[in-house]
Amino acid sequence: MIDRYKHQQLRIGSVSPQQISAWATKILPNGEIVGEVTKPYTFHYKTNKPEKDGLFCERIFGPIKSGICACGNYRVIGDEKEDPKFCEQCGVEFVDSRIRRYQMGYIKLACPVTHVWYLKRLPSYIANLLDKPLKELEGLVYCDFSFARPITKKPTFLRLRGLFEYEIQSWKYSIPLFFTTQGFDTFRNREISTGAGAIREQLADLDLRIIIENSLVEWEELGEEGHTGNEWEDRKVGRRKDFLVRRVELAKHFIRTNIEPEWMVLCLLPVLPPELRPIIQIDGGKLMSSDINELYRRVIYRNNTLTDLLTTSRSTPGELVMCQEKLVQEAVDTLLDNGIRGQPMRDGHNKVYKSFSDVIEGKEGRFRETLLGKRVDYSGRSVIVVGPSLSLHRCGLPREIAIELFQTFVIRGLIRQHLASNIGVAKSKIREKEPIVWEILQEVMQGHPVLLNRAPTLHRLGIQAFQPVLVEGRAICLHPLVCKGFNADFDGDQMAVHVPLSLEAQVEARLLMFSHMNLLSPAIGDPISVPTQDMLIGLYVLTSGNHRGICVNRYNPCNRRNYQNQKRSDNSHYKYTKEPFFSNSYDAIGAYRQKRINLDSPLWLRWRLDQRVIASRETPIEVHYESLGTFYEIYGHYLIVRSLKKQILFIYIRTTVGHIALYREIEEAIQGFSRAYSSGT
C-alpha cells in the first residue's frame, strides 16, 4: 500500500476470498471474466506458446511481448484510435508486457484447505483460537477422523445408532462404504464434518469478543487460586495463563485489523504472476523453470482430480474422495512451505523443491536480498582496513571507488572549467586518468559526505556519515574508534558506501549522521567510541615500560631485558647502561626513529619546573656531584639538577618513548578541542 506521503509500505496478513478474486479476476472488453487457472500446463511443446488457461496463459496474465497477442497481431499501446483493445480471436489484451509482473491468477479449490502457516507454525493461530490441541486439529485437517455436526430436532444417521464424537473414529472406514459419491456427500454435509471444511465451520462460528471475555474471566479465576504447593500443578496453571494471554492478544489483533478467523482456511488459492516464477531458456535449448511452477502443477492436477470425483463420477467410494481431499491439502502445504510436515518433496535429482516460504524467507529471500538489500546506484562495497592516521569523522576511499561514485560530479566539473567540451570527452579523460581528474575529484569530495553501512544494520549507528579522503589501494580505511558502533573488526569485514545526492540528504548526513556526533550509545547513553581490541593492545605496548622506579632498574640483576643490562665476561655482576638524557620530546622520538633507543627503553626527559612533580618529604636515592658544583638528586621517578646554591636548574622525569608519544597525542587533542571551543564562543 502507498499512503498520501508516497511512503511505500508492505503488510502481510490474511485476506478474504473476495479480495483474492478481486486481485486475480479481470473483465475483458467483450465482457468475459478471466483469472481462474484450470490447466496444469505451461508452454506447448511444439509452438512454444503459453497454454490457454494454464500457468502462463496470456489471457489471464497479459501478453509476453508488449502489444502482441497470442495470434501475432500488433496494436500500438496507448493509442485510443486503435480498436479493439484486445484480440477477439485469442482474447489477449494489447497492453504492456510488464503487466505479467503483477497480474495474478487464482485456483478455485474443490475443497477448503487450511493455510499451513496458521496451522503448523508455532504458535498455531488456529489451535489458539479454537482452544484445541494441535495434534487433534491436524488429524481433523488430514481426514484422520471426523466429528458429528450439532443438528438439533432432526433425526440423524449417527444419532439413531447412539454414536458420539469419540466413537466416530471407528466408523472412518465403514461409513463411506455404504454410500456412492453423491450419497456420501449428502450424508457428510448433513451429519459429519472432516477436513479443512470442519475447521472453517468452527472458525466461522467464533465470536472474538466472547473469546476475549471468557479468557479474561478464566485468567482471573486462575489467579485467585494462588499456589497449590504442587510444582507440577503450578506449572500447568502458569502455562494455561500464558496461553490465555496469547489468545486474548490474537483475538484483539483480528478485531483491530478486521480479519475474519475463517480466512485462515483457503477456498481460492492465489497464483503468482508469471514473471515472479519464470521459465527461461539456457544454452543448448534447455529450459529452466522455477520450482513453484511444478508445485502449482501438482496442486492443479490433484484439484482437478477431486473436482472430477465430486461432479462426474457417481460410483466412486466416499473414502476415495476423502483421500483425494487429503492429497489436495498436502499439495497446497508443499506449495506454501515444503517440508513443514516432515520429509520435504524432492525432484527426480533428489533436490528439494523451493516453496513459497523458501523464496521469501532467509538471507537470500525476496525481502532481505531483493527488497531490503537490493543494489542501488551511487554505491560501492569493499573490505575495510584500519586507518590510524585518519580523523574520527573521515574515511579513506579508494581511488577506483571514488572516481566511479563521483563520476557525474567530476564530469560536471570538467565541463564547467572548460576542460572538456561534452560528456564523451570528459569520460575519455576519466578513463585515461589524467592528473586534472584527481584534482577535480578532490574538490568535489571536500564538500560531499558519504554514508558507510555495515550489514546487518541493527541500530542507527550501523550507518554513519564520513568525510571521504582519497587513499591508495582497494580497501576502505576506517578509524578504529567507530568500529564498535558498526560492530565491525578488521578480519575481512565488508562495508557499503553510499553517496547522498539531494541537498536534504547531505544536510541530514552532516547534522545527524556524522561519526563525531554519535559518540554515545542511543540505547543506554554510554560512550560507544571507546578503545577496543587492537587499540587496547597498542596502549598497553606504549605504556609497558618501567613502572617500578629506578631502584629496580639499577640494582635488580634479573631485569636486564627491558633495561639493556649486559653481563660481563670477566666477573659475575652486570654492567649498567647509562640512561640517555633528552631536552625535549622531539629529540626522544627522533632517537627512537633512528633506532638508537627502544620503545620501552627508560630515558630522562627535561620537564618544566613544576613543583607538583616533586614529592614532599622524599629523600633522594642517589646524589651525583659534578666538578662545577652542580649536583643531581636522583629520586624514584624524577631527577633534579641543582646549582651550587641549591637552586633548581632543571627537572628530568623518568619515562619511555611510548609514554611520550601517548602524552603528545593527548595534548594535541586537548589543544584542538580548546581552539574549537574558543572559536565557537
UniProtKB/Swiss-Prot annotation:
Keywords from the UniProt entry: Chloroplast, DNA-directed RNA polymerase, Magnesium, Metal-binding, Nucleotidyltransferase, Plastid, Transcription, Transferase, Zinc
SMART domains linked to this entry: RPOLA_N
Note describing how the cofactor binds: Binds 1 Mg(2+) ion per subunit. Binds 1 Zn(2+) ion per subunit.
Cofactor(s) it depends on: Mg(2+); Zn(2+)
GO MF entries: DNA binding; DNA-directed RNA polymerase activity; magnesium ion binding; zinc ion binding
Database matches in Pfam families: RNA_pol_Rpb1_1, RNA_pol_Rpb1_2
Catalytic activity: RNA(n) + a ribonucleoside 5'-triphosphate = RNA(n+1) + diphosphate
Positions contributing to Zn(2+) binding: C69, C71, C87, C90
Compartmental location: Plastid, Chloroplast
UniProt-listed Enzyme Commission number(s): 2.7.7.6
InterPro entries documented for this protein: DNA-dir_RpoC_beta_prime (IPR045867), RNA_pol_asu (IPR000722), RNA_pol_N (IPR006592), RNA_pol_Rpb1_1 (IPR007080), RNA_pol_Rpb1_3_sf (IPR042102), RNA_pol_Rpb1_clamp_domain (IPR044893), RNApol_RpoC1 (IPR034678)
Residues that coordinate or bind Mg(2+): D489, D491, D493
Position of the signal peptide: none
SUPFAM superfamilies: beta and beta-prime subunits of DNA dependent RNA-polymerase (SSF64484)
Record carries keyword Plastid: yes
Cellular component GO terms, alphabetical: chloroplast; DNA-directed RNA polymerase complex; mitochondrion
Gene Ontology BP terms: DNA-templated transcription
Subunit structure of this chain's protein: In plastids the minimal PEP RNA polymerase catalytic core is composed of four subunits: alpha, beta, beta', and beta''. When a (nuclear-encoded) sigma factor is associated with the core the holoenzyme is formed, which can initiate transcription.
Free-text function comment from the UniProt entry: DNA-dependent RNA polymerase catalyzes the transcription of DNA into RNA using the four ribonucleoside triphosphates as substrates.
Family: Belongs to the RNA polymerase beta' chain family. RpoC1 subfamily.
Family annotation (HAMAP family): RNApol_bact_RpoC1 (MF_01323)
This protein's name: DNA-directed RNA polymerase subunit beta'
Source organism (scientific name): Nicotiana sylvestris
